[in-house]
Amino acid sequence: AARAVFGLARTGSSYSNGSGDFAIAFSTAKELRVTHGATTITPRPALPTEAVSPLFEAVLEATEEAVINSLLKAETTTGNGRTVQALDIEKLREILKKYGR
């Protein structure tokens, strides 16, 4: 989860005090569940060192993809006396093409 903010940065996000950017990570894997009230230490498997960097890269890519998907699927929204228009996907394509993206 700590690496997800780097994926946000790839999309142009900036950070400031109170910006509210955070990431949460959890597992639903049955074999990793901890019994409530457990008092014993249970050893957990660890990734080999050479697998950590590819995992971090996957986190960045997944976060970046999630941001892009949310921008492209957003709808025009009105609230608090303001209206924010949804992105025009065709116009975005033209801009991206213009800049070789």
Report the location of each language-model feature.
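A structural signal for small-residue-enriched, beta-sheet-centric alpha/beta enzyme cores
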Residues: A1-R101
